[in-house]
A protein has these predicted regions:
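Membrane-proximal helix-turn-helix segments that form the acceptor-binding/catalytic region
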Residues: 8-29
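Aromatic "clamp/platform" in nucleotide-sugar-dependent glycosyltransferases that forms part
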Residues: 159
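Conserved acidic donor-binding segment of nucleotide-sugar-dependent glycosyltransferases
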Residues: 194-201, 210-215
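Conserved donor-binding/catalytic core segment of Leloir-type glycosyltransferases
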Residues: 69-87, 93-96
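Carbohydrate-associated surface elements
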Residues: 35, 57
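Short hydrophobic beta-strand element within catalytic cores of glycosyltransferases
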Residues: 176-179
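Nucleotide-activated donor-binding/catalytic signature segment of Leloir-type glycosyltransferases, i.e.
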Residues: 120-142
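Short alpha-helical donor nucleotide-sugar binding micro-motif in glycosyltransferases
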Residues: 138, 146-151
Length: 256
């Protein structure tokens, strides 16, 4: 595994060095969020004004509420690569550990593959949460939407997200969301979810506790989340933004 990791790191830096040579030569650049625009401008030493934003699209026909599926009470859901540090899953697991003594029925459903003998597996075992945390991988988008339909709430514990598809997909499914303020997540969630600081398992536990105890708040956030995605982040909206950008670029070129 060590040599594979080194190879991946080498490839990443080769790609990054290539990008740093190419980017300054481009007249028009597009990224998916204000947070990404700021980071790219800083890392590549270019003006933010050179970067346009077209948000990622979410398929709201697949990721949608499914009333026919009954929600499981006290079922928290997360999408996170188990051993990817930036996804912050370890903080959520520690939050679940805190709440386990208060809520006997509490369980965590994770969309992600658990690596045997990985850090996450060891943490789950160390905290005695093997029967509370269930990992799923290799699912279709429809199967993911069906899992969301069973969830009481969704949590995005990421330390950084360039956009935040997990939050957007959960919101599109009508699931109330708790997310960190990492990267672009506040742009996606807005006021349609509960936002907490990154790397703070105590804040995550407090937010989960609050949401599980308040059905009115869950219903309010679920409705606001679905509406926000339809208004700002559907594929129809993303396509329209991209078409408009193409028109602006063509107009600028013609005017030269």
């Amino acid at each position: 595994d060590t040599w594979k990791l080194r190879l991946l790191i080498r490839r990443w830096y080769t790609f990054l060095n290539m990008q740093k040579k190419v980017v300054p030569q481009l007249d028009n650049l597009v990224t998916v969020s204000r947070a990404s625009r700021q980071d790219i401008a800083t890392d590549f030493d270019i003006a933010e004004t050179k970067l346009d934003i077209v948000h990622n699209g979410i398929d709201t026909r697949v990721f949608r509420p499914i009333p026919a599926i009954e929600r499981d009470e006290f079922n928290v859901m997360a999408t996170a690569s188990a051993d990817a540090p930036l996804k912050g899953l370890d903080y959520l697991i520690r939050a679940i550990s805190i709440l386990a003594g208060e809520i006997p029925e509490l369980k965590l459903t994770v969309l992600g593959k658990l690596k045997e003998d990985g850090k996450t597996a060891k943490l789950v075992s160390q905290l005695g949460l093997e029967n509370r945390i269930h990992f799923y991988s290799g699912l279709s988008s429809q199967e993911v939407a069906e899992l969301y339909a069973k969830a009481t709430c969704a949590v995005v514990p990421s330390i950084y997200e360039g956009f935040g598809l997990p939050a957007g997909e959960a919101m599109a499914c009508g699931v109330p969301v708790i997310s960190t303020n990492g990267g672009a997540l506040p742009e996606v969630v807005g006021d349609a979810g509960i936002t907490v600081p990154t790397r703070d398992h105590l804040a995550l536990a407090d937010a989960i506790r609050t949401l599980l105890a308040d059905s009115n708040l869950r219903h309010t956030l679920a409705a606001k989340g679905r509406s926000r995605i339809l208004e700002l982040f559907s594929w129809e909206v993303a396509a329209g933004e991209m078409v408009q950008l193409y028109r602006e670029v063509v107009s600028r070129e013609v005017a030269r």
